[in-house]
Regions:
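DEDD superfamily 3′-5′ metal-dependent exonuclease/proofreading module
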Residues: 10, 15-739
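Cationic, low-complexity basic patches in intrinsically disordered or flexible, solvent-exposed regions
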Residues: 6
Length: 739
């Protein structure tokens, strides 16, 4: 076997030589080959490879998340469009077994010129499927397709100075290098009398291009086959429609990466051999070691190298999760600490933000908050002169003091600890809230950005604002869900109408406008830029409105409108913390339960069914009002997001998949219960076929329940409404406590 010779010539360790000799003598009964997916997992973490290899033994939170990720980014459509632009002769995606796919690839390779999708190659114990392979004589173009945006005028695959492969695309480029390594090896082994030249490309969404075709999303619809596998079904006239555009305006481009791939394979890129990247091995050494470990189903003998990325490990089970699967994350950490420590101590994992050096702490064997000193966290982002509340440095120490129960640390915060585990700066809030102008306006946006532009003139990953919700709070304390918008025509560009509707909602008075985080400010500034280059008759009026409620930079100078939106998230960071509910996280999905469980006033008020009647709603009828407060068996307020209508069957996702839709949150129900779910739901509305939508089981030919689109729109409206109502809950909590 060629691999054995390679191992002898290149591996320094005797153990590796014996391993490969052993692999030749004992072939496993059920053959398992080292694939692109396995290689990608090993790059992320070599110790994960064993867990990935044994899916029936180990819990994996990402096990079924490919569909959601690809749907959210438009990956399915990019792949199909790439095949059309490349003029693929034959697609081998339906040949599932190793031997059959390799056999058919070899048959097609006999042609002088051919373009193959999912071309299969095996070399020793390694196997790859190439997204698109073009053969012209003895010249082969190996094209990997990714739903990532790229600007070749600015972005670089590799630093010219250090030769380090850019971290943002490193996994992609290494993926292509691995494919080239296997394909070249397979070709040399099978066609020893021929000399093939393999050239590598990454085909990605081109940020320098604007679509010259409207409705690309209508050309590609997603269905699931009888085995549950997702597939793209193209419109009958897809080629005809695409041919209406000009080749120079194609929004996906094959960027050459052959030079950097050659350097990777030769072990000459700057990241190799240091900083624990690939176990400090060179590329070929690492690939062969990982291939052996994977195919022989054996672990690395060394203890895992821990880092801050371990905190987001998909092989970590949730506390209290009961099933028969093992916890790979725990197995790794138990090599370095005790089970008692993992159960009882507060990990540094929940410390987030700037000024932290978690990798350094971990390398020094400090995994828990009670092991940190003041020297470990740098002071950063100090308060502005005269500004009240916590800065981010102080907030970190507040969290540490509450998590660890350290009385000495708590001393500096004790005058603002209003109940066990709850910090509230009443005086700071009172000072801040005195500057607000009534009526108050709470707004929240839902947006999407995918690789293939929906509309003519758009760039890849350009933002589309498809929904907003608006609650109003009057000076007498009355509350109303005053307005909302959801794009009802997914074939029309919604951004400008979105701003028109928002303007109508907010121009009735001069009251303060609130957002949660910076997203709304960024989106409105993005739409202002889109308006600048548009032909809309009212564009000047709309831009002027946007400038009144946002801030933006121009030539390094920040300009803020007279009603520049107030960020409620920043107020939470400065004035409020509930350790039991938040644990270092500040998303509105974490803060809402923290506020509700901290307030007897809110518990009493919203345990009554007043929402929809006393508090008017755009979506809850007055004769069917609801109560937002429901207590669980532990007398704990359940998250109101869990009360939303069940639409998991509409999305076609599992409970575990729902958990993954929003990073750092754990909404585990079948509801549109976070921003990631809303984005996924809207993209499903755009991309999934009527047959796929119906296949979820939500509707039948004689069904009396709402259609898929109607049910999904209702869920989106309810979700966004709760986002702005959550902001109202936070305001009410603050208002009640400053009386």
């Amino acid at each position: 076997m060629v691999l054995l010779k390679f191992g002898i010539n290149n591996f320094a360790g005797q153990e590796i030589f014996v391993i490969f000799a052993f692999n030749l003598l004992f072939k496993p009964m059920t053959e398992k080959l080292f694939t692109k997916s396995a290689f990608k997992v090993s790059l992320d973490c070599p110790w994960k490879l064993y867990y990935y290899r044994n899916p029936n033994l180990y819990f994996n939170a990402n096990a079924e998340n490919d569909f959601l990720e690809s749907l959210a980014q438009g990956g399915f459509q990019v792949g199909e469009l790439a095949k059309i632009y490349s003029h693929v002769d034959e697609d081998l995606k339906d040949i599932m077994d190793y031997d059959g796919s390799v056999r058919r690839t070899n048959e097609l390779m006999k042609r002088e010129n051919v373009c193959i999708a999912e071309a299969a190659f095996r070399w020793g114990n390694m196997f790859v499927r190439v997204d698109i392979l073009k053969k012209v004589g003895n010249h082969i173009s190996l094209i990997e397709v990714k739903a990532k945006s790229w600007d070749d005028t600015k972005d670089k695959f590799c630093s010219e100075k250090t030769r380090v492969v850019s971290s943002g695309v490193r996994s992609y480029v290494y993926d292509v290098a691995f494919q080239k390594y296997v394909v070249e090896g397979a070709l040399k082994e099978q066609y020893s009398d021929q000399c093939f030249k393999v050239e590598a490309f990454l085909m990605m969404a081109d940020k320098t291009k604007r679509a010259d075709i409207n409705g690309l999303n209508k050309l590609f619809k997603i269905e699931k086959d009888k085995n549950g596998r997702s597939k793209v079904v193209t419109a009958p006239d897809v080629v005809e429609v695409l041919n209406q555009g000009k080749p120079e305006n194609h929004v996906i481009t094959a960027f050459p990466v052959d030079g950097v791939c050659n350097a990777i394979i030769a072990g000459k890129t700057g990241e190799q051999g240091k900083d624990d990247w690939m176990l400090n091995l060179k590329f070929t050494e690492y690939v062969q070691l990982m291939a052996y470990k994977y195919c022989s189903n054996s672990r690395l003998s060394s203890a895992p190298l821990l880092s801050k990325t371990c905190f987001d490990c998909e092989y970590r089970k949730a506390k209290g999760q009961e099933d028969n699967l093992l916890d790979g994350w725990r197995e790794c950490w138990l090599k370095h600490t005790t089970n008692s420590n993992l159960e009882k101590l507060s990990p540094i994992a929940s410390l987030n933000g700037s000024g932290l050096n978690r990798d350094k702490w971990i390398k020094n064997g400090r995994y828990f908050m009670d092991e940190l000193t003041y020297d470990d966290i740098k002071e950063y982002d100090p308060r502005k002169a005269g500004e009240s509340g916590l800065d981010l440095y102080e907030r970190k120490w507040l969290q540490i003091s509450l998590e660890t129960g350290n009385e000495e640390l708590l001393e500096r915060f004790k005058d603002k600890i209003v109940s066990p585990g709850v910090y509230l700066d009443v005086e700071g809030l009172k000072e801040e809230m005195a500057t607000w102008k009534y009526p108050l306006h709470m707004i929240d946006f839902e947006t999407t950005a995918v690789a293939l532009p929906f509309y003519e003139g758009m760039k890849p990953y350009e933002q589309v604002a498809f929904q907003f919700s608006h609650h109003i709070i009057r000076e007498d304390g009355s509350i109303e869900h005053a307005g909302q918008y959801l794009n009802e025509d997914v074939n029309e560009f919604p951004n400008f109408e979105f701003v028109r509707r928002l303007k109508v909602q907010l121009e009735q008075d001069k009251g303060s406008v609130f957002r949660y985080a910076n997203h709304e400010n960024s989106i409105l500034n993005c739409i202002a830029e889109q308006l600048e280059s548009s032909k809309e008759k009212d564009k000047d009026e709309l831009i002027e409105f946007i400038r009144t409620i946002t801030h933006h930079k121009d030539n390094g100078v920040t300009y803020a409108g007279e009603r520049d939106m107030i960020d409620l998230l920043e107020l939470v960071k400065r004035f409020f913390y509930n350790v039991d509910e938040m644990h270092g996280r500040n998303s509105i999905k974490q803060v809402l339960p923290a506020v509700l469980n901290s307030s007897e006033y809110l518990k009493e008020k919203y345990a009554k069914p007043i929402y929809g009647s006393v508090i008017k709603s755009q979506n809850i009828p007055a004769d069917k009002p609801i109560a937002w407060i429901h207590m669980d068996e532990q007398d704990h307020v359940e998250s109101p997001y869990h009360l939303l209508d069940n639409i998991g069957n509409l999305l076609g996702v599992t409970e575990e998949e729902m958990k993954q839709m929003e990073m750092n949150d754990s909404d585990a129900d079948f509801q549109v219960a976070n921003g990631g779910a809303a984005l996924t739901a809207y993209n499903k509305l755009l991309f999934c076929s009527d047959e796929e939508n119906a296949s979820t089981g939500a509707i039948t030919e004689k069904s009396t329940v709402p259609s898929f689109s109607e049910a999904l729109r209702t869920a989106l409206l309810r979700y966004c409404e709760l986002d702005t109502m959550s902001m109202v809950f936070i305001w009410e909590y603050f208002k009640d406590n400053i009386k």
